């Protein structure tokens, strides 16, 4: 009886996991499967806020700005959004989804590098029009493994038209 209950519980977890990630198309070329493309800004936000906050075990809503782009890396029209925290990040997406019907958002690729104490995730995302900027933006998240707290997001920055 306990074994049967355990099997039902595990099948329910798999069903919920599949329902949450069904909007994302897995691409074997991506270093981060299931995080490739979506046509809905809300789904992108949901995935970011949910999966990555759980993965980083973030304890705080506030993220310091991390200026990844120096003068050699920036494009000619590159604009860096400074002092971005989760609340402002969410407000951008909320405003975007209210003003666009089924917006086209494609995640070109996501790169994740990790060692014992640092994790960096970089997204290259393109859209028809994004927060008043067109064509392309990058998002960089840097996490640090604190011995007392565990993984926590320390820096987040976004750059547009790069």
Curated annotation (Swiss-Prot):
Keywords: Signal
Keyword Signal part of the UniProt annotation: yes
Pfam families: DUF5390 (PF17365)
Domain of life: Eukaryota
Signal sequence, start to end: 1-21
Protein name according to UniProt: Uncharacterized protein C28H8.2
Source organism of this protein record: Caenorhabditis elegans
